[in-house]
């Protein structure tokens, strides 16, 4: 699930470029990706789980998860694109798997396994190899990109320790998306950056984006955290920049360096190591 989620996330730039061409800005897109997915999530939740009810005691935790993961993280990351290249932002953002693993060990006394450490090292070195020193490097972009990694790590750790995991995943995702969408819509309105799509085709692209990311990638990632834990899921999510790289080469005609190819191989290796650890654990 985490791997499939990372692949879908890796396709986001391709979809976003076409949406931006229609006049929609990044802040509005984050809001729309949450809001447009709500009817689908609600219908599936009602059909599958017969209800959208949740314990009132779960609402504060859901709200914190929503603000961190569905509002703060994407808003910070997307704002960094105004000052530095998206590939640089992605590399800086991916400090979050390190923060999740280290945070789990220091704050929650999780045990560090040899497989986990090896996977984390491969992931870290692999993502760093995506960095190109010739690209723009502005502190105004570095700070929000780094903060997006911090908020994402907090989101993953909170999600992996969420007490009410018995809440059906579609119901959970509905409330997380509703709160996240409301917060980002408010930010867009207050900052006067609300630029809605104009044509039917533009709305269609935004809907496709919302269904792919919110109903697809986000839901799969949330479920994977519940199943395998935040540390492993965050390392596996490093396949996202690798997917973006191959999309850029095969579809957008972008160039590729030896470092990026080696980085991709290391990221894939980190995923295989984590997967192998899971197989060994089941056999034992």
Which residues are covered by each model-predicted region?
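Membrane-interface helix-cap regions at the ends of transmembrane helices
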Residues: 11, 15, 22, 37-57, ...
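Hydrophobic transmembrane alpha-helices of multi-pass small-molecule transport proteins
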Residues: 103, 112-132, 152, 238, ...
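Transmembrane alpha-helices of multi-pass small-molecule transport proteins
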Residues: 22-72, 99-100, 150-158, 173-192, ...
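Helix-helix packing/entry segments at the starts of transmembrane helices
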Residues: 6, 32, 74, 88-95, ...
């Amino acid at each position: 699930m985490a791997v499939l989620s990372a692949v879908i996330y890796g396709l986001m730039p391709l979809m976003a470029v076409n949406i931006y061409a229609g006049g929609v800005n990044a802040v509005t897109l984050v809001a729309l990706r949450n809001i447009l997915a709500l009817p689908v999530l609600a219908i599936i939740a009602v059909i599958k789980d017969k209800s959208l009810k949740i314990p009132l005691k779960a609402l504060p935790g859901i709200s914190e998860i929503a603000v961190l993961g569905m509002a703060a993280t994407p808003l910070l990351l997307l704002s960094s694109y105004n000052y530095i290249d998206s590939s640089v932002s992605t590399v800086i953002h991916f400090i979050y798997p390190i923060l999740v693993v280290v945070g789990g060990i220091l704050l929650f006394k999780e045990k560090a396994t040899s497989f986990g450490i090896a996977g984390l090292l491969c992931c870290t070195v692999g993502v760093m190899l995506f960095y190109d020193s010739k690209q723009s490097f502005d502190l105004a972009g570095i700070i929000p990109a780094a903060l997006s990694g911090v908020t994402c790590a907090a989101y993953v750790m909170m999600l992996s320790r969420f007490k009410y995991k018995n809440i059906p995943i579609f119901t959970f995702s509905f409330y997380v998306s509703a709160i996240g969408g409301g917060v980002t819509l408010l930010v867009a309105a207050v900052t006067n950056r609300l630029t809605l799509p104009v044509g039917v085709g533009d709305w269609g692209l935004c809907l496709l984006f919302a269904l792919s990311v919110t109903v697809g990638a986000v839901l799969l990632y949330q479920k994977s955290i519940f199943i395998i834990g935040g540390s492993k899921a965050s390392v596996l999510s490093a396949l996202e920049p690798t997917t973006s790289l191959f999309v850029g080469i095969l579809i957008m005609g972008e160039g590729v360096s030896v470092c990026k190819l080696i980085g991709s191989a290391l990221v894939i290796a980190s995923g295989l190591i984590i997967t192998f650890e899971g197989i060994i654990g089941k056999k034992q």
